[in-house]
């Protein structure tokens, strides 16, 4: 291996393809030498316990909770009624906890949240993903459009009831100010409480940041996938949220209308690009880890992603430098023995093999380019370079017997493979490491979080 490395360095000096882009340091991965992780966040406990169907998640390098449950030590997701007294209106029109944040006690909410966190995550050394899924309203007034406009209307009425002497213009301005102040307090203080109680967890809000690039249904061939500038500006205004987050959880769910299309890649790419931008501006010492939420099946269906769309979601997420991807799923996955078998078949076929492909390729790239002290990131984010095992050099083999199933990757990198990686990828060093290949250790670069 040493002589190949020397040849590789010589070839690279000749190529001189590094484009000089500065990459902010990253937080070290959750698990040592695992630069890209795949999580399972679907309620499939019944597949194992009731139907005796093992989805083989660990076989295919997928991190999951005990018994493949929705929440546990690997990843815990908090829905609206699971954490504190979150004020909102649900999808059926039911009112909860004062409806708007300025009409509910923050102290009451935090006290209840503390109890909920202790109950749902009893382990104080929790080291997994802590995801708060609050989607009913957004903390910025101008983003509460469509069905969320009710929160603006309720806020205006709330201000009017308290200050009937004010003009309508002043009432509206006051309503916006009070709403945004209360919304910020609810989201920020909840996050800080969770981080104080379980400081080793990776905490953030699901779907933050968003890109609002959903116009593929109307633009057709004219669709670019780019985040509107106004939405990027609004994301900039949420710096208070990014600074207090310890992870970001955008989503890259694909609707079936995007199946195997150029628009699917545009959609995913720009959502990830925005998340990586926010990750780099949130802190001064390191970029926040990004874990993109995806679905193994097209949204609102039980149709598995095509091979092309696995590349679009999993492959794109890894190549852009995210820390991992989280597969979310519905109760439909475990509703019957047939549905469990369908998930298992997909896992043992294209899905599982592709996950092994990407996670292994990411580890190899980290080892040969970054000395295991960083992860590989595309040099040019808009390129079509992916972290894939080279088919001429590697094989993925699945072995199974009556007691176990395991996946083995066989092969070795050739010189041309190394050159390809160096031409197309660069290192994002973990905290404490620097240099083109993350070869220099510097304790002063590690700051206390």
UniProtKB/Swiss-Prot annotation:
Coiled-coil intervals: none
Tissue/organ expression: Expressed by the venom gland.
GO BP annotations listed: carbohydrate metabolic process; hyaluronan catabolic process
GO CC entries: cytoplasmic vesicle; extracellular region
Span of domain EGF-like: 427-438
Annotated localization: Secreted
UniProt entry keywords in alphabetical sequence: Disulfide bond, EGF-like domain, Glycoprotein, Glycosidase, Hydrolase, Secreted, Signal
Top-level taxon: Eukaryota
Disulfide bridge map: 47-340, 211-227, 365-376, 370-427, 429-438
Active site: 135 (proton donor)
EC number(s) recorded for this UniProt protein: 3.2.1.35
Pfam families: Glyco_hydro_56
Gene Ontology MF: a single term: hyalurononglucosaminidase activity
Glycosylation (residues): 67, 103, 111, 153, 357, 401
Catalysed reaction, written as an equation: Random hydrolysis of (1->4)-linkages between N-acetyl-beta-D-glucosamine and D-glucuronate residues in hyaluronate
Signal peptide: 1-23
Role summary: Snake venom endo-hyaluronidase that degrades hyaluronan to smaller oligosaccharide fragments. In venom, it is not toxic by itself, but increases the diffusion of other venom proteins by degrading the extracellular matrix. In addition, it displays antiedematogenic activity.
Subunit structure: Monomer.
Family: Belongs to the glycosyl hydrolase 56 family.
PANTHER family the UniProt entry points to: HYALURONIDASE
Protein name stated in the entry: Hyaluronidase-4
Organism: Cerastes cerastes
């Amino acid at each position: 291996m040493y002589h190949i490395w020397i040849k590789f360095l010589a070839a690279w000096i000749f190529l001189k393809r590094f484009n000089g882009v500065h990459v902010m340091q990253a937080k070290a991965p959750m698990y040592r030498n695992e630069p890209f992780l795949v999580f399972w966040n679907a309620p499939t406990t019944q597949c194992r316990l009731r139907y005796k169907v093992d989805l083989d998640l660990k076989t295919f390098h997928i991190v999951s909770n005990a018994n493949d449950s929705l929440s546990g030590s690997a990843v815990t997701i908090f829905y609206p009624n699971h954490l504190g007294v979150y004020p909102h209106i649900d999808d059926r029109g039911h009112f909860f906890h004062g409806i708007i944040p300025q009409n509910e006690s923050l102290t009451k909410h935090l006290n209840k949240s503390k109890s909920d966190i202790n109950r749902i995550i009893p382990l104080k050394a929790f080291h997994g993903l802590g995801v708060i899924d609050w989607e009913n309203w957004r903390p910025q007034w101008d983003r509460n459009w469509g069905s969320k406009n009710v929160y603006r209307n309720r806020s205006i009425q709330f201000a009017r009831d308290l200050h009937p002497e004010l003009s309508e213009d002043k009432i509206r301005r006051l309503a916006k100010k009070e709403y945004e102040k209360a919304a910020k307090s609810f989201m920020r203080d909840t996050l800080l409480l969770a981080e104080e109680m379980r400081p080793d967890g990776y905490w953030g809000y699901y779907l933050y940041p968003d890109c609002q690039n959903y116009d593929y249904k109307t633009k057709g061939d004219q669709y670019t996938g780019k985040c509107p500038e106004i939405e990027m500006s609004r994301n900039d205004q949420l710096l208070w949220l990014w600074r207090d987050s310890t992870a970001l959880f955008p989503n890259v769910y694909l609707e079936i209308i995007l199946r195997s299309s150029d628009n699917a890649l545009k959609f995913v790419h720009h959502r990830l690009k925005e998340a990586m931008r926010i990750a780099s501006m949130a802190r001064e010492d390191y970029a926040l880890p990004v874990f993109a939420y995806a679905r193994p099946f097209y949204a609102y269906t039980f149709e598995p992603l095509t091979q092309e769309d696995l590349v679009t979601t999993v492959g794109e997420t890894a190549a852009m430098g995210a820390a991992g991807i989280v597969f979310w799923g519905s109760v439909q996955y475990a509703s019957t023995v047939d549905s469990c078998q369908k998930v298992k078949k997909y896992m043992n076929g294209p899905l599982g093999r592709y996950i092994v492909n990407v996670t292994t390729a990411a580890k190899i790239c980290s080892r040969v380019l970054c000395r295991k002290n960083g992860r590989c990131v595309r040099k040019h984010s808009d390129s079509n370079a992916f972290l894939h095992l080279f088919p001429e050099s590697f094989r993925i083999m699945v072995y199974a017997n009556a007691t176990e199933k395991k996946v083995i990757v066989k092969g070795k990198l050739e010189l041309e493979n190394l050159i390809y990686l160096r031409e197309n990828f660069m290192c994002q060093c973990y905290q404490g490491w620097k240099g083109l290949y993350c070869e220099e250790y510097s304790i002063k670069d590690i700051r206390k979080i």
